Swiss-Prot record:
Job description of the protein: Channel that opens in response to stretch forces in the membrane lipid bilayer. May participate in the regulation of osmotic pressure changes within the cell.
InterPro entries: Mechanosensitive_channel_CS, MS_channel, MSC/AndL, MscL_channel
Gene Ontology cellular component list: plasma membrane
Protein name: Large-conductance mechanosensitive channel
The family this protein is said to belong to: Belongs to the MscL family.
Primary location: membrane
Length: 132
């Protein structure tokens, strides 16, 4: 059972996922800081509050409070992370595609052109003529 678990853990997909989770956690803290220290002050120019988490709406006659500011912070964080992940995936896909040859390129390399066939035929005829 331990051997099976070790094989499972050592597979590339599990290790890739573990690295992704760790990097994702690190990225989240960076994005939180970006939102808090750079984006919120810019938004405060329009809203009037530096800390968006303070924006809330209380329903009259109740104690229910809609924490709109916290929600806006989370939406901003999500959008930033989504854009970063999209750009990373797009970059990796582009690198992967650069390494692959298209089917047409492979077919072109495999099949000799008509000119190459004629040249080989001429070469073979000349070689046979010299040996006779």
């Amino acid at each position: 059972m331990i051997k099976e678990f070790k094989e499972f853990i050592m597979r590339g997909n599990v290790l890739d996922m573990a690295v992704g989770v760790i990097l994702g956690a690190a990225l989240k803290s960076i994005v939180d800081s970006l939102t808090k220290n750079l984006i919120n002050p810019i938004i405060s120019l329009f809203v009037g509050q530096v800390d968006l988490s303070g924006i809330a709406v209380t329903i009259p006659g109740t104690k229910a409070v809609f924490q709109i500011g916290n929600f806006l912070n989370d939406v901003i964080n999500f959008l930033i992370i989504a854009i970063i992940v999209f750009l990373i995936v797009k970059g990796f896909n582009k690198l992967r595609d650069m390494g692959k040859k298209t089917e047409e390129e492979v077919a072109e390399e495999a099949a000799p052109t008509q000119e190459e066939l004629y040249l080989k035929e001429i070469r073979d005829l000349l070689a046979n003529k010299d040996h006779q």
